[in-house]
Amino acid sequence: MNLLQEALAKIQPVDAVMLAKAQAKLDKKTKPLGSLGRLEEFARRFVAITGDLQPDTAKKIVFTFAGDHGVVEEGVSAFPKEVTPQMVFNFLRGGAGVNVLARHTGAEVRVVDVGVDFDFEPTPGLIIDKVAKGTRNFAKGPAMSREEAIAAIEVGIGLANRAKAEGVAMLGTGEMGIGNTTPSSAIIAAISGKTVKEVTHRGTGINDAALSHKIRVIEQGLAVNKPDPRDPLDVLAKVGGLEIAAIAGLVLGAAANRQPVVIDGFISTAGALIASELNPHVKEYIFAAHESVEIGHRFMLDRIGAEPILDLKLRLGEGTGAALAMGLIEAGVKILKEMATFEEAGVAEGEY
């Protein structure tokens, strides 16, 4: 079996018994039942995922995957593709939004070149695992071969496996790739059957005329490639991206290893959607960091069955929302681990 087949075979439902045990433990804390709302949800889900009533949350990593997109030559983005490697250098210097927010929540950022059209020198903090120098223009033909899509997925699975071996408690997804809202919209349109117009927004801030053009390009790509909605690998290969594939792999690897994975915004959720279409139990391991301004994001979240943690009108990507949400998930787990019980505090319990 290859890495993908192994990961898919290992994914099991989360532990319902541990979920109930976590809730019982939370109910003994010095508070009215359920009064910490979603923080309690985060704690019990974390326990059910890991199988540990005293889970560790110390080591958190946001993997920011970078890749270029051939469809950019159609003029679908406000920025040129040269910005992708420029932003990779910004990540490595610690100057990007994800770096700032990860420092704030105590997470590490690891940058992964899975498909940038640029030759990086070996650099501390950069993982070079390039499958190709970007995708091909899916307005004219498939973005990738099926083999390339699987290879990029396996980059993500491999990173999840290494993170598990390192004792990482929580994984986060992020991305960088000029033009990558275009394949993300194509993926949700192909899988859901929604019209391209319903799921396509402004990405980096394009104007009305450019948005109409972007919609036409995606419609053309879907017509040319005819991705099979029943085959997520076919959708990914024909209209997806290398970084989206690697995110799908990281999510699959996390689920196979019983690790919580926090997905960022629209592009990250495209990867998570591919993963959950490959194995429906994947959704039980996902924490959705936030709901993006991108209109297609809600359709993705609904199909996965994930309720976003934050709604801050974010649309940057990189892993910014994932880094922020990690802090709230960790707060919920700390309530479970550190808050006193009624008995410990000598406080009378309520009668329900």
Swiss-Prot record:
Enzyme class: transferase
This enzyme's EC code(s): 2.4.2.21
Reaction catalyzed: 5,6-dimethylbenzimidazole + nicotinate beta-D-ribonucleotide = alpha-ribazole 5'-phosphate + nicotinate + H(+)
Gene: cobT
GO molecular function, one term: nicotinate-nucleotide-dimethylbenzimidazole phosphoribosyltransferase activity
UniProt keyword annotations, A-Z: Cobalamin biosynthesis, Glycosyltransferase, Transferase
Function statement: Catalyzes the synthesis of alpha-ribazole-5'-phosphate from nicotinate mononucleotide (NAMN) and 5,6-dimethylbenzimidazole (DMB).
Family stated for the protein in its record: Belongs to the CobT family.
Organism of this sequence: Geotalea uraniireducens (strain Rf4)
Active site residues per record: E318 (proton acceptor)
Example GO biological process: cobalamin biosynthetic process
Pathway: Nucleoside biosynthesis; alpha-ribazole biosynthesis; alpha-ribazole from 5,6-dimethylbenzimidazole: step 1/2
Entries under CDD domains matching the protein: DMB-PRT_CobT (cd02439)
Record's protein name: Nicotinate-nucleotide--dimethylbenzimidazole phosphoribosyltransferase
